[in-house]
Amino acid sequence: MSTENMILDVHLAEEALPKKAGGPQSSRRCMLLSLLSFLLVAGATTLFCLLHFGVIGPQKEELPDGLRLVNPLTQTLTLRSSGIPSDKPAAHVIANPQNKGELQWLNRRANTLLTNGMQLVDNQLVVPSDGLYLIYSQVLFTGLGCPSTPVLFTHTVSCVAVSYNNKVNLLSAIKSPCQKETAEGAEAKPWYEPIYQGGVFQLQKGDRLSAEVNLPRYLDFAESGQVYFGVIAL
């Protein structure tokens, strides 16, 4: 009910009351009606103001700071799409899904990155300048059933440094998807084994980085971009 309707109802109530001549009771009644009218008008006005300015009523939900999920890879690729200037070398390459016999890296594809001097040469990322670099890589293996001989997957990120020209492992991991052999006659179920590695290293200009696996035929290329290799200067 609006404020105007409340005021009108109070006036109509006053007119509907029988008017009596003078006396203490009549005076008290008039005072009570006046006080009631004032309280109704004041209350309605206050309620309208509180609702209008949002002091009461439904409140908008806001996410607290720090609860937003952030994908570091998406954040890195945004530098390219947004055109934000940056002099930091960066690279993000993905596996070639057409070449299932080996792990071949591609840079001229969607969601890949090669900026500020970074190069992809002979399946290796070449560092353009000295400094600290974040190196990361992810691979995903898949198969059907578990053989009698345990399957071991290795994922290695290596560096051939210009200073000593030897290949050194920077990151290395070994995993097995099978705990035991699939029983004879049992249904062979699919399995998936991801490996993710990352670390910060001091590199020199001309250092060559590579990411390799021992059994590339088990790599899962069902979705583009889920097998990747990247370097970001810090």
UniProtKB/Swiss-Prot annotation:
Keywords: Cell membrane, Cytokine, Disulfide bond, Glycoprotein, Lipoprotein, Membrane, Myristate, Phosphoprotein, Secreted, Signal-anchor, Transmembrane, Transmembrane helix. It is a single-pass type II membrane protein. Gene3D superfamilies: 2.60.120.40. The record marks S34, L35, L39, L40, C49, L50, L51, H52, T78, L79 as: Cleavage. One of its GO terms (cellular component) is cell surface. InterPro entries: TNF, TNF_alpha, TNF_CS, TNF_dom, Tumour_necrosis_fac-like_dom. Disulfide bonds join C146-C178. SMART domains: TNF. The keyword Phosphoprotein applies. It is found in: Cell membrane. The modification Phosphoserine is found at S2. Homotrimer. Interacts with SPPL2B. This is Tumor necrosis factor. The lineage of its organism: Eukaryota, Metazoa, Chordata, Craniata, Vertebrata. The gene is TNF.
